[in-house]
Amino acid sequence: MSVNLPTIVVTGATGFVGRPVIDRLLQESVMVKCLIRNNDDRNKFVPHDNLSFVIGDITAIETLNIAFKGAWGVINIAGLREFWSQDKKQFYKLNHIGATNVFKACLANNIQHVVQVSTPLAFGAPASIPFNENTPAGPHPSNYGRSKYLGDQAGLLMSQNQSLPLTILYLAAVIGAGDNKETMEVGRALKGNMPALIGADTTYAYLYVRDASEAIVRAIMKKETIGKQYLIGKERATTREYFSIIGDIAKVKVPDRNIPEKYLVPMAKVMELVSRFSGKRPQLPLDVLRTTQQGSLLFDGSLAEKELGLTYTSLSEALAEAIAYIQQHQKD
């Protein structure tokens, strides 16, 4: 182990995006330190001479100060990536206050570069599409989008007023192996548990998980990205096209019928009420309906392609990997 290499601390290292970021960082001449919640999380990684762990929590700034001491860079991936939580305050505790803690700890420990990983949903419903990095945010239909926006804004304010060396990446909807959450609905489609589509003709941008990790690592390794924001992702598909690709790859029947969101709101409200007591995620979170109601979320990601030199994997390849992963784990 070389003590002369710069250390990069990664929050959210055990997550869907975090694990590929660790793999990619270990290809660089850096030391990688994973912020983990408990010692059992170490078992999620293959041992490596340049890999270490520190126990901490983005909601406890004192643990961040310990974790960041002596580090060169920080990648903040930790947060709540969901459209529902039994306690909606968790979105803001993790995505806003947690991110703010990360930025404060970076300043306190003289971190040379911090990359904040965010989402295009932080732009809410912009006045025009496709939007770019300079487009003002519009109203936010989801707690996830608004909480991420608030966290990003906290970082931008510190960048302007306190010289926080910040880069923000807004990742399109991430697809690939290893996603154990239900946000992208791949597993549900494979089970045939989807009676109809919602927002069938709404278009979104998608991003292969290893393209996401490549963008994150390139951003932190280039000092020229400090002070900049990048929208990451290029592959586009309507919801109908998205599930059609899943059906074609997996040879399963997927719905083609669309139900307008306004007819589903009463049912979704009842589901959320039940979920508030059961603690189980509703099949149709209200924030999903509100997000699809706002229409297509299209952005211009050409700046990242140009300045980070990114090329993108096709949506069909990303979905094929996600499907294979889910099918394998269903067998296991």
Where are these regions (language model features)?
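NAD(P)-dependent short-chain dehydrogenase/reductase
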Residues: P165-Y204, I246
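Substrate-positioning beta->alpha
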Residues: N180-M184, I198-M221, G227-K228
